[in-house]
């Protein structure tokens, strides 16, 4: 009969378990503290048979389990790397790798044996924690199987990905201590490069705005993406009924973000693909490269060029900001070239394991690296992508958020969008004419010079993306920027934002106002508002925004500052539903004459014990 060959070797499996069981013990010990012991602690506080206690017990057990899932990210990140370092450690020594590869075991068998031993150990630890947690919960007559199953599944998916990533790092190097370095770099390199490029563009581009991190950058940062996918899912309020005199109490049920399963499944699929790549590399890996920085010769130029370029860009930028803070583009370029060459030399010395690396070919390659590094910096400086002058077409914009000092609004009507785009173009034209950038100057630096304002725009585009810009511009009287900015700050919704009454619309308008108060800061006098008075004040604020006594001039500080003598704490209390209310703070700018007249007619009284957070509301009627 033909002899059948197994895909793994039982002896290797047993050997790995015997050698690396302390790692599994540590993994389980940490998890025991994180989950089962926390379940016991939370459940003991609910030990009883009173009405409502069982519901609280269920909520607390559920919350402990769901809140432990972010810990799975950290545990999988650490122990995925440790497990990979353990099972592939023999590849880092010429003696052990020669002994292992001399055994009558194929590399495919060895690969699957090591992978199964590592993933099997992590899975065994997870299942043990699952059972211990269930046992601890059962002692209090309730087990949240759904939450426990969710924890087990997500933890397994994370462990698969991080172990695969650690195995890839172990397969490309012959140094054991280089594995965690590569592992950490692969988890954050995309984010670090984005931060470097973002900082450079902020230096060079007029109007650059620190917007949200692009989606593809977050996906290339596994630990951050997975953390965001399983943490901060919010909480659902739950009302629990107890016997009198306790009555109804409010609790929170922690929820898992909707993206948790999809994100972890995607990364687990990537982990399987990485393991397939590791299998291929393992079969091709030369045994004699044990102890070398890179296990494959074709990876060495990639490594030194990556270290040279990334180190030059990042460390050069850091050097410029720390040692030459006032330096310009030339200073930045020199810093990046110097640091790039140093990193390039250091990488080659590590790869060659010697200091004598200089020859004609090496100098030519160094010169090529310097040219590429300089080209990258120059291309960013020249804005070859057209970022600085990119202006969206009006038909491509679904809505726009505009902000100038304290005046802001969000609109989707074509007229508002077109006005903001016109201002956008005018600001760029003024910059092209003057070349003036004021972002890094304080107001004291420009004292006696042109009047400046911060202007921010945020376009939401039809393709689902956004375009954000932020400028500090000088406003010359009669210029296009002055004219267009005047039109925008004099919109009704812009005036409403200056007063603060714009937020009232989301709560139902004036009819939602139930009370309020006005307090003078200088005398600590207070005027409490009845429901009718508070609604009258809200109506007058809306009237001031819609029909101002005169146009606002963005060149004047009066357009956003308090009216003289009306620097007050004004709060309107609005009802959201039958059980919830909130407050809307108001300002009294100079143009709000109706509000000023109304406040002058109020009766103020001194009350040293007055606390705005405990104002009694006598006229709350939930009709």
Q: Residue ranges of each PLM-predicted region?
A:
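Aromatic- and glycine-rich beta-strand/loop motifs that create alpha-glucan
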Residues: 1-27
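Terminal transmembrane helical anchor/hairpin motif
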Residues: 3-5, 41-66, 191-281, 286-295, ...
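Secretory targeting signals
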Residues: 39, 62, 69, 116-179, ...
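Long, hydrophobic alpha-helical segments
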Residues: 67-96
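Helix-loop-helix units of permease transmembrane domains in multi-pass membrane transporters
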Residues: 87-120, 286, 290-291, 530-550
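Internal/C-terminal transmembrane anchor helices
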Residues: 303-311, 345-387
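Membrane-interface segments at or immediately adjacent to transmembrane helices
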Residues: 378-463
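Short, structured surface segments that line ligand/substrate-binding pockets
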Residues: 434-474, 550-586
């Amino acid at each position: 009969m033909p002899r059948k060959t197994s895909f793994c070797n039982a002896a290797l499996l047993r050997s790995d378990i015997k050698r690396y069981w302390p790692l599994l013990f540590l993994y389980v010990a940490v998890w025991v503290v994180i989950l089962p012991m926390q379940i016991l602690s939370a459940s003991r506080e609910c030990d009883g048979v009173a009405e409502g206690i069982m519901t609280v017990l269920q909520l607390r057990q559920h919350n402990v389990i769901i809140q432990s899932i972010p810990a799975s990210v950290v545990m999988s990140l650490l122990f995925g790397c440790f497990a990979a370092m353990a099972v592939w450690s023999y590849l880092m020594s010429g003696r052990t790798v020669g002994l292992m590869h001399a055994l009558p075991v194929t590399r495919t068998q060895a690969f699957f044996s090591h992978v199964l031993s590592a993933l099997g150990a992590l899975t065994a630890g997870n299942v043990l924690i699952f059972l211990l947690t269930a046992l601890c919960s059962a002692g209090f007559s309730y087990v949240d199987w759904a939450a426990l199953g969710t924890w087990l599944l997500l933890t397994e998916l994370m462990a698969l990905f991080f172990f695969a990533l650690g195995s890839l790092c172990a397969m490309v190097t012959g140094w054991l201590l280089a594995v965690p370095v590569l592992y950490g770099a692969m988890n954050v390199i995309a984010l670090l490069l984005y931060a470097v490029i973002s900082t450079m563009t902020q230096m060079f581009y007029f109007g650059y705005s620190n917007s949200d991190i692009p989606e593809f950058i977050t996906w290339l940062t596994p630990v951050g993406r997975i953390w965001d996918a399983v943490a901060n899912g919010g909480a659902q309020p739950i009302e629990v009924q107890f016997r009198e005199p306790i009555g109804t109490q409010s609790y929170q049920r922690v929820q898992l973000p909707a993206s948790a399963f999809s994100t972890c499944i995607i990364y687990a699929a990537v982990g399987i693909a990485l393991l397939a790549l590791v299998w291929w590399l393992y079969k091709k890996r030369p045994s004699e490269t044990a102890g070398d920085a890179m296990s494959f010769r074709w990876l060495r130029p990639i490594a030194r060029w990556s270290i040279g370029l990334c180190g030059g860009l990042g460390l050069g930028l850091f050097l410029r900001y720390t040692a030459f803070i006032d330096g310009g583009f030339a200073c930045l370029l020199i810093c990046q070239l110097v640091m790039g060459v140093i990193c390039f030399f250091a990488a080659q010395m590590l790869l060659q394991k010697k200091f004598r690396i200089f020859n004609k070919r090496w100098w030519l390659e160094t010169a090529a690296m310097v040219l590429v590094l300089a080209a990258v910096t120059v291309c960013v400086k020249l804005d070859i992508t057209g970022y600085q002058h990119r202006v969206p077409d009006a038909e491509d914009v679904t809505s726009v958020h505009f902000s100038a000092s304290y005046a802001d609004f969000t609109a989707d009507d074509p007229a508002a969008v077109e006005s903001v785009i016109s201002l956008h173009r005018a600001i760029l034209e003024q910059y092209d004419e003057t070349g003036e950038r004021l972002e890094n100057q304080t107001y004291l630096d420009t004292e006696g010079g042109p009047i400046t304002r911060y202007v921010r725009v945020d376009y939401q585009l039809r393709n689902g993306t956004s375009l954000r810009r932020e400028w500090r511009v000088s406003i010359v009287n009669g210029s296009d920027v002055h004219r267009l900015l005047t039109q925008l700050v004099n919109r009704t919704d812009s005036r409403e934002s200056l007063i603060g009454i714009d937020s009232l619309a989301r709560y139902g308008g004036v009819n939602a106002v139930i009370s309020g108060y006005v307090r003078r800061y200088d005398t600590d006098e207070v005027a409490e508002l009845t429901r009718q008075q508070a609604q009258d004040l809200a109506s007058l604020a809306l009237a001031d925004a819609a029909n101002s006594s005169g146009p606002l001039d963005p060149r004047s500080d009066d357009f956003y500052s308090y009216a003289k003598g009306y620097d007050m704490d004004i709060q309107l209390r609005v009802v959201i539903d039958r059980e919830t209310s909130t407050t809307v703070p108001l300002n009294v700018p100079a143009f709000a004459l109706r509000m000023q007249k109304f406040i002058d007619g109020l009766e103020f009284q001194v009350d040293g014990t007055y606390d705005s957070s405990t104002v009694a509301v006598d006229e709350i009627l939930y009709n």
